[in-house]
Amino acid sequence: MSQDVLTLAQDLISRESVTPLDEGCQQLMADRLSAKGFDIESMVFDDTTNMWARRGNSGPLFCFAGHTDVVPVGDLNRWHTPPFDPVVIDGYLHGRGAADMKGSLAAMLVATERFVEKHPDHNGSIAFLITSDEEGPFINGTTRVIDTLEARNEKITWALVGEPSSTHKLGDIVKNGRRGSLTGNLTVNGIQGHVAYPHLADNPIHNAAPALDELARMKWDNGNEFFPPTSFQIANINGGTGASNVIPGSLEVMFNFRYSTEVTAEELIKRVLNILDAHGLDYDISWTFNGLPFLTGEGPLLDATRDAIKQVTGTDTDPQTSGGTSDGRFIAPTGAHVIELGPVNATIHKVNECVKVADLEQLALCYEVILEKLLC
């Protein structure tokens, strides 16, 4: 088996690029892409490093998308090996970012190098959109690059995001869409007082409880063939001074919707406000839009991805929309078709993160076949 993917993955993992740091990962990729005829554009916004690399000027435009930043390592004492000293043990590459997603970055780059060597006059264009702000607040990363591309009418036709989509074996699941995400920060106002004199106070916890119960029990929609029903979850709740004899003056609640294409964020907000008002609450609320739902249906990208996985691994992939958000949510609204295909996600964000070495080589082959099916 070729060592190209493994060697590059190890080089990337060895760079301690905890979000929003990049630590030279993008420059390493840029140097290799430049040697294959890519024009490199670095886009730095505040503390975030982004790279837009493109080969070709015509359409259709196929884009590999991913991130060089990783999450913090956590308790070092729980790691069997140093997280930024990548090592292969029993066929698995260990290190922070091995699965999420430096292994995918290595597979993308090597697949592209091989493809360009075989097909120097390929149809259309190939691009890389790489950020160091996917694991962080996602303010200055992919979303800013997309804004720049949109401003100059540079349109992505197909985007393949290298997020670890697989569950049990490589390619068993791809993501052809994601649910929308909407977060609410609610403050219910009351009057602080002594618990022995409740008539002189106004308990916001007691007041809010029926409304929160109604929100938690609400059936927001029925979902559809592509998306499960919309989910409402209370993520954080805080009220009180810590003393047993004080009625709190306020209650803070953070909740999140993961919503389907059957409902809009505006509809969810309206329904929440109606419930809060119906219970007569004195409240303040703010909203954070984390991403719209998107879906890539049948078409060239999904067909090429499905066929490539079958050809390389023998697996019949299952397109799904479950799980969290990804940077695909910033690309899809431009009209691009978006698919996520990456390694097994069993150890992502955990101590002792690892990925099967053989999967990285197969992933590179999948990416190469997808390029061939779309641009040859």
UniProtKB/Swiss-Prot annotation:
Zn(2+) 2 binds at D100, E135, H349. Pathway: Amino-acid biosynthesis; L-lysine biosynthesis via DAP pathway; LL-2,6-diaminopimelate from (S)-tetrahydrodipicolinate (succinylase route): step 3/3. It is an enzyme of class 3 (hydrolase). It catalyses: N-succinyl-(2S,6S)-2,6-diaminopimelate + H2O = (2S,6S)-2,6-diaminopimelate + succinate. Its cofactor is Zn(2+); Co(2+). The active site is at D69, E134. One of its GO terms (molecular function) is succinyl-diaminopimelate desuccinylase activity. It holds the Pfam family Peptidase_M20. The keyword Acetylation does not apply. CDD domains: M20_DapE_proteobac. Its EC number is 3.5.1.18. Keywords: Amino-acid biosynthesis, Cobalt, Diaminopimelate biosynthesis, Hydrolase, Lysine biosynthesis, Metal-binding, Zinc. GO terms for biological process: diaminopimelate biosynthetic process; L-arginine biosynthetic process; lysine biosynthetic process via diaminopimelate. Zn(2+) 1 binds at H67, D100, E163. The keyword Protease does not apply. Binds 2 Zn(2+) or Co(2+) ions per subunit. Homodimer. Catalyzes the hydrolysis of N-succinyl-L,L-diaminopimelic acid (SDAP), forming succinate and LL-2,6-diaminopimelate (DAP), an intermediate involved in the bacterial biosynthesis of lysine and meso-diaminopimelic acid, an essential component of bacterial cell walls. NCBIfam families: dapE_proteo, PRK13009.1. This is Succinyl-diaminopimelate desuccinylase. It comes from Shewanella sediminis (strain HAW-EB3). The gene is dapE.
